[in-house]
Amino acid sequence: MRVLGIETSCDETGVAIYDDAAGLLANQLYSQVKLHADYGGVVPELASRDHVRKTVPLIQAALQEAGLQAQDIDAVAYTAGPGLVGALLVGATIGRSLAFAWDVPAIAVHHMEGHLLAPMLEDNPPEFPFVALLVSGGHTQLISVTGIGSYTLMGESIDDAAGEAFDKTAKLLGLDYPGGPMLSKMAQQGVEKRFVFPRPMTDRPGLDFSFSGLKTFAANTIRDNDDSSQTHADIARAFEDAVVDTLAIKCRRALDQSGFKRLVIAGGVSANRTLRAKLAEMMQKRGGEVFYARPEFCTDNGAMIAYAGMVRLKGGTHAELSVTVRPRWPLAELPAI
């Protein structure tokens, strides 16, 4: 069975084809980073228009990469939310229309479930149950996962997501959009503990996060010190260390609370090398395992949507004839299969 996956939730157009026997057959991705760079962030209207231009050519490229024709596709999966409503509608409309034209099932996929299941694309996929840390520009959540669709929210950010805090702090440091990865690169040149940032909400029980205060702390630190490149690198190091430590502390608590031995990290920030190293060290000491996708599957992509669509289709899920998207869509509302 082959599923075509379409991802258009924000500023990346992704199309992939997944075969339940042969694995990933094609993976095409177009990033809109250059389009939005001049504006310092994603402009929803521009994102939607670019998805209109790029989605169909990427579908054609994916079919060519896989050596397939339209009649070889058994289902079409598309991201139905959460995300930017206009961007979601582009992928959903194209995906639902293709499914209707090809007379195959359509599957509306939850974007964050796609991220959560992305490590399943690797050679050593995690087994259930596990704790999942979903960490991206729009979400920071700890989820107890006991099966597909069996998701219990353990904690989440009460304000900025971790990725959003990275991007905002990077902007304060004068870095271009998207600043998160650039901040991490700058942090590698920073002196450890020259500056020490707080670890928000780690001095109280619970698994919720708060990162907006770190941005304010960074702004004050930048204001009160010289603007040399070394000082900026030291501030970047202090900021990244604070975020990574906070995430690790909360993950440890979630594992203690659940009793699980496996940890999955997913979402764009899961590509951060410092975070990966910190959690790998923590899990080794605990005698557990940590799982994550390769970097290209951490950010938005069609492969995770195709895979999640395959899993949902096998579980009996398919979309209605109408096109419906959900810009806000709690993960816990998904049915278990």
Curated annotation (Swiss-Prot):
Q: Which InterPro entries match?
A: ATPase_NBD, Gcp-like_dom, KAE1/TsaD, Peptidase_M22_CS, TsaD
* The enzyme's E.C. designation: 2.3.1.234
Question: What GO CC annotations are associated with the protein?
Answer: cytoplasm
Q: Which cofactor does it need?
A: Fe(2+)
What's this protein's family per the entry? Belongs to the KAE1 / TsaD family.
Q: Which HAMAP family match?
A: TsaD
Protein name (record): tRNA N6-adenosine threonylcarbamoyltransferase
Gene behind the chain: tsaD
